């Protein structure tokens, strides 16, 4: 046991910096809170849901809990600013069996997290989520995809978020 202790002691970071205290680690703080969500389905009907975003793990990560009002679609994400890589990373999972990984961060007055995938039939697809029109009590979230390497983007889903009181 004594032979192992020096290895752990040597590996510790003795700096006085608080983990996740960089300005970049706070770039997504606008998202923290409880939100009402609304969108139009393919037939033009208004659909609703809720989304709760919490700081977890000592403020080092964000946990998202999304649910449609009828409970038919439920998902979670975990987001963290990766100081070594210099960008945000997010992992999304949901009750459809999806597991999606994104990277990105602020881009002007928006936040963009994106990913690239190759389908089973060999097609290359780019996907991104865009947080825009960010205000203290509201923002717009767009889910877009591109099949031509980002030359054109198709809007697949727009959610309007308003903060719960």
Where are each of the predicted segments found?
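Bacterial N-terminal signal peptides
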Residues: 1-6
